[in-house]
């Protein structure tokens, strides 16, 4: 419905009703010198003018490019039913369901989401989501700090640099000791990580697959951490969890993920959702909403928000986090996506993505001067070292309609010639072949 502003007559009637002469009188309690002299806003536009302006801006978008970008965010196919079901008014307008008697549908959907992600990651408990993968990782670190009463955190440098930047920002005033262990050609340095985990450490924080696409089994590292009474925290890629060793199998205490790859379009970076799971002993440390299943006095199944004493709206001073919202709609989309695909469909999505990535790696490394950054297993994403600048390659091929990947040197000094290439089930073998031919033409 278009916004229809108040007419001068409407404003006059409202001012008369509340007993003032002008709108400025409403702010009489604020000293004049503290009020802004001008808001420096342009003149308002009509609805037609606004639509024309937005259409002109949207026309500048490139929708015809073939993109091999990844770096933590992936263009997987989203079944049309996800949009159709999640846009229903019963879900689309719902927020945190504080009144369970009026929101059983939403509460059950969140409960099923929690169940689904626990099964996917092989963990005991989950919350109703947080904002994104980075905020989930920060909250996981703070869970470890509270649970262990320690302030040292060991972080693998191969963890997403986007997440590491967020963690540095979040923790800048928390008097925590963040120890970043350098990677070795895109691989975690296991010996150095173990050496950094001691009796003062709250948690070791890793990612699988990591930013460079490398797949690693962290079972030994988590066992080592447990021997020092530290926690194992891992960030994972949900789609790949259908075929990889799970956090639960590795012995992780807390597992988080960005849920973008299951049901969320890339959409200029959001909205996404942060998935948080943990082992049962840590459930009272997990932030945000948790939906539980119970029975009413008549024996009927009901869904409620449970363990609310952890939350800010109940005990502000002692809450586990100041997060006071969640991504319920995005969580619903992820639930619908997972349900529509089922276990076999999710495995097939991962296998097709990995198949394309293997083919891409073979084609690209057949070019002169191109080699894989490391020889570790990878899933749907891999890094290659080029004989020229990756930034130059990205600029030249993007201008021709192909985004070849992500230039790793943007975040890692000394790696300007490293290109990170991601594939999903949406990429065809023909597109991969064209990428290889275009890259070969400029090397």
Swiss-Prot record:
Q: How does it assemble?
A: The glycine cleavage system is composed of four proteins: P, T, L and H. In this organism, the P 'protein' is a heterodimer of two subunits.
Q: Record keywords: Oxidoreductase included?
A: yes
- UniProt catalytic activity: N(6)-[(R)-lipoyl]-L-lysyl-[glycine-cleavage complex H protein] + glycine + H(+) = N(6)-[(R)-S(8)-aminomethyldihydrolipoyl]-L-lysyl-[glycine-cleavage complex H protein] + CO2
The protein's name in its UniProt record = Probable glycine dehydrogenase (decarboxylating) subunit 1
**Role noted for this protein:** The glycine cleavage system catalyzes the degradation of glycine. The P protein binds the alpha-amino group of glycine through its pyridoxal phosphate cofactor; CO(2) is released and the remaining methylamine moiety is then transferred to the lipoamide cofactor of the H protein.
Single biological process term from Gene Ontology: glycine decarboxylation via glycine cleavage system
Q: Which CDD domains match?
A: GDC-P
This protein's superkingdom? Bacteria
InterPro entries assigned to the protein according to its UniProt record, in alphabetical order: GcvPA, GDC-P_N, GDC_P, PyrdxlP-dep_Trfase, PyrdxlP-dep_Trfase_major, PyrdxlP-dep_Trfase_small
Membership in a protein family: Belongs to the GcvP family. N-terminal subunit subfamily.
